[in-house]
UniProtKB/Swiss-Prot annotation:
One of its GO terms (molecular function) is adenylyltransferase activity. Was identified as a drug target. Inhibited by a series of 4,6-diaryl-5,7-dimethyl coumarins that directly inhibit the acyl-acyl carrier protein synthetase activity of FadD32 and kill M.tuberculosis. They effectively block bacterial replication both in vitro and in animal models of tuberculosis. Quinoline-2-carboxamides have also potent anti-tubercular activity. CDD domains: FAAL. Monomer in solution. Changing residue 552 to D: Phosphomimetic mutant. 55% decrease in activity. Involved in the biosynthesis of mycolic acids. Catalyzes the activation of long-chain fatty acids as acyl-adenylates (acyl-AMP), which are then transferred to the phosphopantetheine arm of the polyketide synthase Pks13 for further chain extension. Can use dodecanoate (C12), tetradecanoate (C14) and hexadecanoate (C16). In vitro, displays a preference for long-chain over medium and short-chain fatty acid substrates. InterPro entries: AMP-bd_C_sf (IPR045851), AMP-dep_synth/lig_dom (IPR000873), ANL_N_sf (IPR042099), FAAL/FAAC (IPR040097), FAAL_FadD32 (IPR047968). It is an enzyme of class 6 (ligase). ATP binds at residues 194-199, 349, 353, 476, 490. It comes from Mycobacterium tuberculosis (strain ATCC 25618 / H37Rv). Its EC number is 6.2.1.20. The lineage of its organism: Bacteria, Bacillati, Actinomycetota, Actinomycetes, Mycobacteriales. This is Long-chain-fatty-acid--AMP ligase FadD32.
Length: 637
C-alpha cells in the first residue's frame, strides 16, 4: 500500500526497495487492474465528466469490477481477430470507451497506438501519417464515431484498411474467452507518437516494463497514497495525458477526467474538480501545460454566486510539456491562494515521450524555484546566477529533481563526455522507463536510444548506472545548478505556443502563401522566450506585447527573405499580411516578423532551413543587423 506513516514517518512506496524500483516478476498494468477488480471491485475506478449535453456536466462512472470486465471483453475480441505483434489504433473520442480501448489492447497482448477521433479538427494529416507508419490491423472506436472512422479510412486500399471495432458494442460475455497475454517486460505495450519537428511522426516503443516504471516514478514524486484522487483534462493521445490518467491503475483509487474542450471553454471545471469533495480525506493531483495555469487564473476563479472551494487538498499539479513561466505560476497562485491553494502545489517538471513521460519535478515540500542568470553567459552555454534586477537577467525555472531509478546527465554531445554542474549541454537519460526505440526506424533509434557515455566527472550524476549503460539523447539543452535540473532551451525545431504544437514548416508555408514578397522556401519559424525578445518588438504596437522580465512564455517569430524586386516595398503591409494569415490559420500571434535580404537565413549542409542557427542569430542581434554569416550559423544545427 502507498502510505504515509504516523508520527511523521516518511512517505512509503511499496515498489521502492532500498531506493530502487522493484516489481514482482512479469508485472504490468493488466495485473494491477485485475488486482483492484478483486479487492476493490465495488469502488469507483474512473469518472468521465461529460459536458456535451449539460453545462454542469454528467458524471459517467465505471467501477473496478466493471472496468476489468470490459477490458477483458475487448481484449478477448482482439485476441480472436488479431495476431501477436499487431498494432491496434485507438480512434475514440475522449471518454470511458477510450480507456477501455487502450486497456483492451494491453489485455490482448497487442500493441496499442493511442490516437484520436478523426473528427478532431486540425489533425487529419497527422493521423494519416501515423496510420501509414504503424500500419494497424485494427482500429478501436465507438458506435457513434464508427461511421466517421470508416469514412476516414475509405481512401486507403482494401489491403491496408484496418478492421474497425466499436468497443461499446462488444458484449461483456466475450470476456469469458480472454487469456492472460504472454507479454514479458521487453514486449512493446504501445507506441507513443511524438510531435516531432518533421511531418513524419515517430512512434516511441514503450514496453510493459517502461510503463509501470514511469507510473511509479510519477506516483513517488507526487507521494501518491491511499485515498488520493487524480483529475485531468489532457488529451489521452498526448504522453502527459495518458500517463496521468494511468496513475489510477497502480494507485487503485479513482480518477476524474473531462475533455480538453471542456477545460478550455470553462477552466473553472478543472479547478472545481481539484477541490475537496464532502467526506474526502485524501489529496488531489493533476498535470497541465503552462498556458493552462494562466487560463485558469483569468477565467477559472469562482463567481460570488458559486459554492465555495477548498483547494487545500491539492498535493501537486505537474507543470510540463512546454517552458514554464514564473508569471503564469504567480498569477495562478494569487488567484487561488484565497481558496487554500498551497504555494507548493504547482510542480514545474520535465519529461518527454522517449522517457514514457516523466523525468523530473519539483520536490513535494518545495515551492517552485526561479533564479535569474546572465543572458550573455547563457548564450555561451554557462549558467551564472545574477540579481533579478541585473541588466542581463533572464528568469529560469527549475525542473526539480530526477525521479527514482532514473538518471539524467548533462553531456557534451560531440565527445559523449559528462559536463560539470553549471555548464549547459545535452540532457541524456538512462532508466527502465526509457523506450526501446522508434517504430520501424532503426537508424534514428540507434542515434537516439543507443548512446554510450564515454567519460564521467568525479561526482557523476550517472552514479549507479552501469558503465556500459545505453543512454537516450533528448535533444534538449540543460544543466544542473544547486542540485536542481534546469532546461536551458529546446534543440528540437517544434514550436510550442500556449500548449499547442505547431510544425514550423506549416507556419513558414502560411507566411509565404500570404504574400508574394517572400522568397519561396526561404522562411524560418521558431519561438523565443518573451523576455528575450528585442526591445523593438515591445516598441511595436502591432506586436501586442508588454515587457515583463519574468515572462518566459514562448513567443512566435517569423524570419523571411525578401523576394527579388520587393526591397523598395513598404514592409508594414507585408508584416500585417503574414501576421493575419498565421493568426487565422494557426490561432497564434506572431510577435515579430523580420524581413531580411536574400542569402541571410542559414541553411544546413543538406539544404534545409537552419532554424536553430537562425534563432541564435536572432537572439544575439546579428540577424537583425545583417552582420552574421549563414555558413557559421548553420554549423550549430
Amino acid at each position: 500500500m502507498f502510505v504515509t506513516g504516523e508520527s511523521g514517518m516518511a512517505y512509503h512506496n511499496p515498489f521502492i526497495v532500498n531506493g530502487k524500483i522493484r516489481f514482482p516478476a512479469n508485472t504490468n498494468l493488466v495485473r494491477h487492474v485485475e488486482k483492484w477488480a478483486k479487492v476493490r471491485g465495488d469502488k469507483l475506478a474512473y469518472r468521465f465528466l461529460d459536458f456535451s449535453t449539460e453545462r454542469d456536466g454528467v458524471a459517467r462512472d465505471i467501477l473496478w469490477s466493471d472496468f476489468s470486465a470490459r477490458n477483458r471483453a475487448v481484449g478477448a475480441r482482439l485476441q480472436q481477430v488479431t495476431q501477436p505483434g499487431d498494432r491496434v489504433a485507438i480512434l475514440c473520442p475522449q471518454n470511458l470507451d477510450y480507456l477501455i480501448s487502450f486497456f483492451g489492447a494491453l489485455y490482448s497482448g497487442r500493441i496499442a497506438v493511442p490516437l484520436f477521433d478523426p473528427a478532431e479538427p486540425g489533425h487529419v494529416g497527422r493521423l494519416h501519417a501515423v496510420l501509414d507508419d504503424c500500419a494497424p490491423s485494427t482500429i478501436l472506436t465507438t458506435t457513434d464515431s464508427a461511421e466517421g472512422v470508416r469514412k476516414f479510412i475509405r481512401a486507403r486500399s482494401a489491403k491496408e484498411r484496418p478492421r474497425v471495432i466499436a468497443v461499446d458494442a462488444v458484449p461483456t460475455e466475450v470476456a469469458a474467452t480472454w487469456q492472460q497475454p504472454e507479454a514479458n517486460e521487453e514486449t512493446v505495450a504501445y507506441l507513443q507518437y511524438t510531435s516531432g519537428s518533421t511531418r513524419i511522426p515517430s512512434g516511441v516503443q514503450i514496453t510493459h516494463l517502461n510503463l509501470p516504471t514511469n507510473v511509479v516514478q510519477v506516483l513517488n514524486a507526487l507521494e501518491g497514497q491511499e485515498g488520493d484522487r487524480g483529475v485531468s483534462w489532457l488529451p489521452f493521445f498526448h504522453d502527459m495525458g495518458l500517463i496521468t490518467v494511468l496513475l489510477a491503475s497502480v494507485l487503485g483509487h479513482s480518477f476524474t477526467f473531462m475533455t480538453p474542450a471542456a477545460f478550455v471553454r470553462r477552466p473553472g471545471r478543472w479547478i472545481r474538480e481539484l477541490a475537496r469533495k464532502p467526506g474526502e480525506t485524501g489529496g488531489t493531483f493533476s498535470a497541465a501545460p503552462n498556458f493552462a495555469f494562466e487560463h485558469a487564473a483569468v477565467r477559472g476563479v469562482p463567481r460570488d454566486d458559486e459554492p465555495p472551494l477548498d483547494l487545500s487538498n491539492v498535493k501537486g499539479i505537474l507543470n510540463g510539456s512546454e517552458p514554464v513561466s514564473p508569471a503564469s505560476m504567480r498569477k495562478f497562485f494569487e488567484a487561488f491562494a484565497p481558496y487554500g491553494l498551497k504555494q507548493t502545489a504547482v510542480k514545474p517538471s520535465y519529461g518527454l515521450a522517449e522517457a514514457t513521460l516523466f523525468v523530473s519535478t519539483t520536490p513535494m515540500d518545495e515551492v517552485p524555484t526561479v533564479i535569474h542568470v546572465d543572458r550573455d553567459e547563457l548564450n555561451n552555454q554557462r549558467f551564472v546566477e545574477v540579481a533579478a534586477d541585473a541588466p542581463n537577467a533572464v528568469a529560469q525555472v527549475s525542473a526539480g529533481k530526477v525521479g527514482v531509478s532514473e538518471w539524467a546527465v548533462i553531456v557534451d554531445a560531440d565527445t559523449a563526455s559528462e559536463l560539470p554542474d553549471g555548464q549547459i549541454g545535452e540532457i541524456w537519460l538512462h532508466g527502465n522507463n526509457l523506450g526501446t526505440g522508434y517504430w520501424g526506424k532503426e537508424e534514428e533509434s540507434a542515434q537516439t536510444f543507443k548512446n554510450i557515455l564515454k567519460s564521467r566527472i568525479s561526482e557523476s550524476r550517472a552514479e549507479g548506472a552501469p558503465d556500459d549503460a545505453l543512454w537516450v539523447r533528448t535533444g534538449d539543452y540543460g544543466t544542473y545548478f544547486k542540485d536542481h535540473l534546469y532546461i536551458a532551451g529546446r534543440i528540437k525545431d517544434l514550436v510550442i505556443i500556449d500548449g499547442r504544437n505547431h510544425y514550423p514548416q506549416d507556419l513558414e508555408c502560411t507566411a509565404q502563401e500570404s504574400t508574394k514578397a517572400l522568397r519561396v522556401g526561404y522562411a524560418a519559424a521558431f519561438s523565443v522566450p518573451a523576455n528575450q525578445l528585442p526591445q523593438t518588438v515591445f516598441d511595436d504596437s502591432h506586436a501586442g506585447l508588454k515587457f515583463d522580465p519574468e515572462d518566459t512564455s514562448e513567443q512566435l517569430v517569423i524570419v523571411g527573405e525578401r523576394a527579388a524586386g520587393t526591397h523598395k516595398l513598404d514592409h508594414q503591409p507585408i508584416v500585417d499580411d503574414i501576421r493575419a494569415a498565421i493568426a487565422v490559420g494557426h490561432g497564434v500571434t506572431v510577435r515579430d516578423v523580420l524581413l531580411v535580404s536574400a542569402g541571410t537565413i542559414p541553411r544546413t549542409s543538406s539544404g534545409k532551413i537552419g532554424r536553430r542557427a537562425c534563432r541564435a542569430a536572432y537572439l544575439d542581434g546579428s540577424l537583425r543587423s545583417g552582420v552574421g554569416s549563414p555558413t557559421v550559423f548553420a554549423t550549430s544545427d
